[in-house]
Amino acid sequence: MSTDTKQIIADALLKNEQAMYGPFFGSLGVTSAMAFAAAGSAYGTAKAGTGIASMAVARPDLVMKAIIPVVMAGIVAIYGLVVAVIVSGKVEPAGANYTINNAFSQFAGGLVCGLCGLGAGYAIGIAGDAGVRALSQQPRMFVGMILILIFAEVLGLYGMIVALILGAT
């Protein structure tokens, strides 16, 4: 193989590595992180909020204790926001410094954070709704509800950690 042919192949590979659609996937990762995490947070807030509303009729004295699931569901959206802001700062126009590997890493990180946030929000909403309703029947259920909510919240935290590792490369 001649040196001219090798140079043509090397130039073609470099052009593919610095494709013009790279920033699209980086931006899609940013969008995925925020949109899915916010959707999970919204579901968790709504589901836990309806449980609080139904519990407050019988036991209005426990409303401030019962608001914890709503706060924890809101934190899931903050995880998505943190990842979206950090990853968006690393998305660059297509060129020598921004490769497909960077773009796909940012896309994967955003998707991981978003989908973990979606799952965490759903888990917090369902567990929070059941926990708040149980709290109105038996106030000693508070510690058990908090433990279950912490385990659900950690799902979103793990997603954020993995997303920051992927998006930082």
Swiss-Prot record:
Phenotype seen when the gene is deleted: RNAi-mediated knockdown causes embryonic lethality. RNAi-mediated knockdown results in increased protein aggregation in the oocytes of sperm-deficient young adult females which is not eliminated by mating. RNAi-mediated knockdown causes hyperfusion of embryonic epidermal cells. RNAi-mediated knockdown results in the accumulation of the aspartic protease hrg-7 in its immature uncleaved form and in the intestine. Causes defects in alae formation in the few surviving larvae and impairs yolk uptake by the oocytes from the pseudoceolomic cavities.
Keyword Transport appears in the UniProt entry: yes
Gene3D superfamilies attached to this UniProt entry: lithium bound rotor ring of v- atpase (1.20.120.610)
Cytoplasmic topological domain residue ranges: 45-66, 128-145
Tissues/organs with expression: Adult H-shaped excretory cell and rectum.
Segments passing through the bilayer: 24-44, 67-87, 107-127, 146-166
One Gene Ontology term of the molecular function aspect: proton-transporting ATPase activity, rotational mechanism
Bilayer topology term: Multi-pass membrane protein
Annotated positions for site Essential for proton translocation: 153
Compartments it resides in: Membrane
Keywords recorded for this protein, A-Z: Hydrogen ion transport, Ion transport, Membrane, Transmembrane, Transmembrane helix, Transport
Keyword presence, Transmembrane helix: yes
SUPFAM superfamilies: F1F0 ATP synthase subunit C
Major site of localization recorded for this protein: membrane
Family (UniProt): Belongs to the V-ATPase proteolipid subunit family.
Subunit structure: V-ATPase is a heteromultimeric enzyme made up of two complexes: the ATP-hydrolytic V1 complex and the proton translocation V0 complex. The V1 complex consists of three catalytic AB heterodimers that form a heterohexamer, three peripheral stalks each consisting of EG heterodimers, one central rotor including subunits D and F, and the regulatory subunits C and H. The proton translocation complex V0 consists of the proton transport subunit a, a ring of proteolipid subunits c9c'', rotary subunit d, subunits e and f, and the accessory subunits vah-19/Ac45 and vah-20/PRR.
Protein name: V-type proton ATPase 16 kDa proteolipid subunit c 1
